[in-house]
Amino acid sequence: EYRVPKTKIPRRGEQAAAAAVRLPFSLRFIGGKGSAASTPRVRLSSEHAAIKFEVIPMEYYHMGTYDVAVVGAGHAGVEAALAAARLGCRTVLFTISLDQIANMPCNPSIGGTAKGHLVREIDALGGEMGKAADVCFLQSRMLNRGKGPAVHSLRVQADRVQYHNYMKQVCEKTPLLEIKQAEIAEIQTESGRVTGVVTSLGAQYTVSAAVIATGTYLNGRIHVGQVSYESGPDAALPSRPLGKNLQELGLRMRRFKTGTPCRVHRRSIDFDAMERQDGDDHIVPFSFGSDPSRMHNQVSCYITYTNEETHRIIRENLHRSPLFSGQIEGVGPRYCPSIETKIVRFSDKPRHQLFVEPMGMQTEEYYLQGMSSSLPEDVQLAFLRTIRGLEHVEIMRPAYAIEYDCVDPTELRASLESKKIAGLFGAGQFNGSSGYEEAAAQGLVAGINAALAVQGKPAFVMDRAQSYIGTLVDDLVTKGCEDPYRMMTSRSEYSLILRQDNADQRLMPLGHALGLVSEERYQHMLEKYQLVAQEKKRVEKTNIAPSPEINAFLESHGTAPLATGC
C-alpha cells in the first residue's frame, strides 16, 4: 500500500487515480525462484488517501527449445549468435529492439590501433565484422604508417545505418539462427547449469547454453548534467530485472560508465575553417576475402581544436557535471576520457584535438570524436561554439554519460564460461571491456565455446602468443579490470609477430578446423603463403649491389642506403 495526499487523488475512479499519482518506485516485480521476472498486472483502488497494489505473479508459457541463447544483439551478441549457428547449433538471438542490432551508439568506426588487429583476427577465424566493415565503410586509413609494420592498424569510418542493416540481414539469413525482439529477465538454472531463459512477458525458452552480451543496457542510466534517467544507449529501453537475477545466481557484478559526444548538423559546420583529412589512396580491406579494387573512399573527415575559451567555459561549469558532483558512481574508461576530464587532468594543455566525422551517407549528422561529455546541453552548445569551424554549430543529439552493470571478468574461464554456472558465457562490455572490436572478438570466442559445450567438445582457448584475441581474453579473466578494458598493442608481449597482415596465416587454420572457414577460403590462404615462401627463397638467392638509383629508392622509403652489396 502506498499513501499519498488526498489532493493528489481525483474523484473519477481508480483508473484516473492511478494515472494521476507519480510513484517514487517501479512497479516491476522480480519473482523468486520458479516465478517470472515481469511487469505484473496491478489492481488499484483509491480509498481515503491510499492506493493499494496487489501483485499477481505472471505465468510462464513455453515458446521453444534451442541449443544456445544469446542475450543482446550488439557487436558481441551478433558474432556469438552467428558462430554458434554456423557450428550447427540451433540458436536464438534476443534483442530489446530489432532496430538496435549491431548498433553503433558511439563512434561509427571500425578498427584503430590494436583494434584493427582484432578485426583481422575475427575475420581469419570466420567472424563477420571485417566483411561488414568492408561493405559499409565511408573512409579507410592505415594508422601508424610512420612506425614499424607490427603496429600498422587499419581504421574505417562506417555508415552506421548501413552497418546495422548489413548485420541484421546476415543474421536473418543464417540457417539455424532465429531472432526475437524480447527482454530477457531471467536465466534459469538447475544443479548449477543453465536450463533456460525467460522474457519479461513470461515466455520461457529451454536452452543448453546462454551467452550474456548486454552491452550498456544492463541497469543502464543516462546522465546529462543534473538530469539522469533509466535508459539504454540512444534512448533505448534498459534491461533491469536480468541484473538482479544474475546477482542472485552468485555472479559478482560491478558498475562501469562510458560516454559519447553530441551529434551535430552538417550545415552548421564551417569545414573550410578546419583541416581536411582524406582517406588512403591504396585501400587495404579488413577481410582477407574482400576485393580492394572495388573499394573507394566516399567522404573526408576534418580536424579542429579546442582553445582557452573552450576550457574556461568547461571549468566554470564543472559543478554541473555529474562526473564531478558524485552523481555518477560507475568507473569510466581510462583511455577515452570526457572533455571535462581532459581539461582537469591535463590542465597544462592549451588545446585538445577533435575529429569531425560523418555518421552515414543518408544523414546530415556528424560525430565529434574526442568530445565525450556529460555536461548540461546548454554548456555543451556554449563550449562547442568557441571552437574554430563550429561557431554556429547546432546540436542534433546531446552528449551523455551512461552507467551500466557488468560482471567481474575474473568470474569467467578462458573459454568465457562462468566458473559458477555451467553453460553461462559472457561477452563484450558485460565482461568489462570497451569498444566494438573487443566486444566482437569476445562474442566470437563465447559463441564458439557455447556451441562446443553443447556438443560435448573441448573448449576453444586462444593463446597470448598466437593472437591479440588471446591476449584480450587472458587479460580479462586473469588480471580483471578496474575500468573499461581497451585493447592496445602494448598489452601484447608478442606484438612484433602478431601483425594484422599475417592474421590469416596465424588463425585461419584454427577457423577451418572449427568449421567456420570454408575449404575454398582455406586453400586460397595456403596458396598465398606458398607464393610468399617461394618469393622469400628467390630474394635470399638474389644479390644487390649498391647504386645511386637503389639508394635513392631506399631512402625515399625511410631505409638506410646500401654501403656494400647484399
Residue ranges and their predicted role:
Residues 439-460:
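Internal hydrophobic alpha-helix adjacent to the cofactor/substrate pocket in enzyme cavities
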